[in-house]
Amino acid sequence: GVSAPAQEERPSRPEGAGTGSQVVGEPIGARLRRWRPFLIVTAALAVVALATSLMQPTTSKIPYAIDNPKGNGTQALAQLLRDEGLRVRSADSASEAAAAGPGTTVAVVNIGLLTDDQRAALARSGADITVVGALYQNFDGLTAGMVPQGASATGVLAPHCRDDDAVAAEALAGSRGSVSVDEDAGAAGCFPVGEDRFAYATARLPGGGRLRVIADADLVTNGALARSGHAALAIRALGHHEQLLWFDASQSGPPSVWDTP
């Protein structure tokens, strides 16, 4: 009779290569379906990590910085001002500070590092300027009514003036540094530390703003803010407008083409 055709011998499946265990040659759709849970979890973790990093406030160790929580920082003052409804932010350059304009207070630390022209631009800006720290500084170009002085005091100081902000503060726990004032130029001094030497002073600026000087920058730091009337004076001297721009001239880079008028 006719013999049955010989059956072709098929290659045996490799041991352990069951369904789903063979990757080579697996359709891309199947791979994606298998990887989908892993991809979803990875994406979720990335989102959580990003959100966490964004929610964590950044801090610095720069003296007098509004994001410095240490004793030499001013983060507490910045928070108090925000609690009063102010919008508080930092300026990165002298040109940005000078562009603030009316309706803004610009707090300036290390003002002596600016040029005469940069200080003059601040004076003409129309903004209120509050100088934080007068010791070893230079006011040329800013005002002719005040001159930084080295006279200091360690005892409690009383206002001895009619300025509303100084009267509200009531007292300062001394002052490292001071300013002399020229009353004929419209300047007035408070909290005297000696003859014609004051821990706080004010004057009118040519641009229409008001100049206020807190001679001792340490008075507004986290470590000293709770003493005497420091907080009251700082909040009032910086809180006359809803916008506060904090500018530390020591943290500003050298003038670039973007900073030139």
Which residue ranges define each predicted feature?
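Short, surface-exposed patches at the edges or C-terminal ends of soluble domains, predominantly
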Residues: 1-261
